[in-house]
């Protein structure tokens, strides 16, 4: 049986909310934390808001890194993984010395199931259907910031640091 991730589906809300809420109660989150890829749905966002409010906290910033679907499909379908040592590469951005062979251990590289274009397209469909409404949700709360994700990594990072005032 394929796992949820390999089918391009989202993990059930209840499980994710419980895990995140437990995690942000830890001592190392006392001075703040960044949630990457969560919440992904309105019910998750509402559950997070409720849980944070119970601790006298709230979401201070929501950042949407905007990247066209075509760019995402191209980026992800270019990723390659070594199943032997876990190293990751990209055929354009992080190429190997010998095409298709891991620089670290010499094993053959693979395109993971969740990076295949058809799986990425399914994940993007799920994103647009379930996650897109969060943009409106956080805009209405006055905490949404948008960053152009087509720029190079350093520029995207700098834009996020500027937003967070870090």
Name each region found by the language model:
Residues 86-88, 101, 106-107:
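Cys/His-coordinated zinc-binding microdomains
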Residues 20, 34, 63, 72, ...:
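Residue-level signature of catalytic and energy-coupling elements of molecular machines
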Residues 28, 38-95, 139:
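ATP-dependent NMP and nucleoside kinases share a basic, alpha-helical "lid"
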Residues 29-33:
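Loop/turn-to-beta-strand initiation segments
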Residues 2-4:
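Short, small-residue-biased leader/transition segments that mark boundaries at the very start
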Residues 108-166:
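NTP-dependent small-molecule kinase module
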Residues 17-27:
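Conserved alpha-helical scaffold flanking the Walker A/P-loop in AAA+ ATPase domains
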């Amino acid at each position: 049986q394929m796992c949820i991730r390999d089918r391009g589906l989202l993990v059930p809300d209840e499980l994710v909310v419980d895990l995140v809420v437990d995690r942000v109660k830890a001592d190392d989150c006392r001075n703040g934390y960044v949630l990457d890829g969560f919440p992904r749905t309105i019910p998750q966002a509402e559950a997070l808001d409720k849980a944070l409010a119970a601790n006298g906290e709230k979401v201070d910033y929501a950042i949407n890194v905007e990247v066209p679907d075509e760019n995402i499909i191209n980026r992800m379908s270019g990723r390659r993984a070594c199943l032997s040592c876990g190293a990751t590469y990209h055929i354009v951005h992080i190429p190997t010395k010998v095409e298709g062979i891991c620089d670290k251990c010499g094993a053959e590289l693979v395109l993971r199931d969740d990076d295949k274009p058809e799986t990425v397209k399914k994940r993007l469909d799920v994103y647009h259907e379930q996650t897109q409404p969060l943009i409106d949700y956080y805009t209405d709360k006055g905490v949404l910031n948008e960053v152009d994700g087509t720029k190079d990594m350093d520029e995207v990072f700098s834009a996020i640091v500027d937003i967070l005032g870090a």
